[in-house]
Design a protein with these regions (language model features):
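Catalytic domains of carbohydrate-active enzymes, especially glycoside hydrolases
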Residues: 1-2
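Metal-dependent polysaccharide deacetylase catalytic core of the NodB/CE4 family, i.e.
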Residues: 5-119, 176-192, 214
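Active-site-adjacent pocket scaffolds in enzyme catalytic domains
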Residues: 33-49, 112-213
């Protein structure tokens, strides 16, 4: 499936504002919120601002490839582990996501939490909103969801090493282990790092070997 954060579903700025949730996250770091400047830097529509609108692409996928699921990345690229946001804010955000998707004849069943900031306290809201699956994290301490502020250098080092050397295991899963309770936790396997053309042949070899052995 393809995952979009739902501001991209708007056909124009008026629709973007119309579907914005009545409750908005009050992040400690205001730079995380797309609402801080009231969309001042967003132009009126797709033709003038293709960076902030994706409706023509979404409609193309919906109409030409109906078997291809379109999932949600939340309405506003919502960060579930950052300070200042609440469960009620998240529910309002997901309500807006479901509403604008339905207006485009799209039902949302799958969610990828932005920055992998999965929050177990919010899963009941997901279930209430009709979300059947979400992408969880690999089962290792350094992949545990946390805020940007709490992502330590030690965690970053382990995550990077794990892309090239098997530290956390193969991170492949039996279906019977995944299908337990709605919404189902479809854990991620690994972060696929970009190709390194210069000076990175050894790392490319290690990365591909890590993937193939799994």
């Amino acid at each position: 499936g393809l995952y979009f954060f739902l501001l991209l579903f708007a056909k124009d700025k008026l629709e973007m504002i119309k579907y914005s949730p009545y409750l908005k996250p009050n992040y400690k770091d205001s730079n995380l919120s797309p609402y801080t400047d009231n969309f001042k830097n967003v132009k009126e529509n797709w033709e003038k601002d293709p960076y902030h609108y994706a409706l023509p692409l979404i409609e193309l996928i919906r109409d030409k490839y109906p078997e291809h699921e379109i999932g949600t990345h939340t309405f506003s690229h919502y960060y579930c582990q950052e300070m200042g946001q609440t469960l009620e804010d998240f529910k309002a955000d997901l309500t807006s996501a479901v509403a604008i998707a339905k207006e485009k004849n799209i039902n949302l069943y799958s969610l990828v939490f932005p920055r992998n900031q999965y929050n177990p306290d919010y899963l009941e809201v997901c279930r209430e909103m009709g979300i059947l699956t979400y992408r969880g994290n690999e089962d290792a301490w350094y992949y545990a969801p946390d805020s940007k502020e709490d992502t330590t250098l030690k965690k970053k080092i382990y995550r990077t090493l794990d892309c090239y050397v098997n530290i956390s295991g193969h991170n492949t899963y039996n279906m019977s282990d995944l299908i337990t309770k709605v919404p189902y936790n479809i854990r991620s396997s690994r972060f696929f790092r970009p190709y390194m053309a210069k000076g990175g042949m050894l790392l490319e070899y290690l990365k591909l070997r890590r993937i193939k052995k799994s």
